Amino acid sequence: MGWTASLDMGSEKMVMALASGEGSVCHLKGIKIMASQGIEHGVIKDKEKVRMCIRSLMSELMKDREIEVMNVALSGAVLRIVERRIVVPIQKKVVEQSDLFRAEQRCIDAYGGGQDEVVDILPVGYAIDRGEMIADPLDRSGRNLEVTYQVYLADYDYLADIQGLFEGSGIQEIEFYPAVRAYAEALDVERAERDFALVDLGAMGVNVVLFRDGMLEYEAHLPIGVRTIDTDTMAAFALSFG
């Protein structure tokens, strides 16, 4: 049985979850939350303070367990999002999973080298032979498959700094992911019967995501969060009743 942990470093709260896994099944074993230090607007400003927070969470949650994978959520403030269209020939006249894999790999390879590293890619639409956009291309016939991806990039040095925070922890692998990936998997978007929007209220920002036909259609980050609303509300009451 392997152990997997996930870390979300917010501007006000830091959350770590621990799960055990057997095959494709995961069982949540515990969650710890503490006040964040060293993070402003979703960006690490003081690595030593962040390291201390992480060590505190790990000591309480993991104890003597050996963690195989640590999944780290990245805020929209450190991600660069670009759209990329990839065209690959359909090998066996009808679209198979292997065609999707080739398109995905070609998209990742397009960003090889440079200062940016690919954190994740999400398909947001498919088309066959330049036809109209569809949500599911599998078993469709044609010559060429066109996939439109939303690509999430992050600065290589910034990711290396985060990995350095876990140095000496014994964790075998550090994985990064954007918040939208967590939304999609937690809500099982592919099986959702209806289109829906999700609003994530953070301390320093608000994420708005729209899913349609089981796929990501729209994503936006608003740089005004709950802390700003609270501050403005308190200021208004002070002016009115002070």
Q: Where are the predicted features?
A:
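Nucleotide/phosphate-binding catalytic cleft detector across ATP-hydrolyzing
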Residues: 1-13, 17-196, 215-217, 240
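Acidic, glycine-rich loop-and-beta core segments that form the ion-binding/anion-interacting portion
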Residues: 189-242
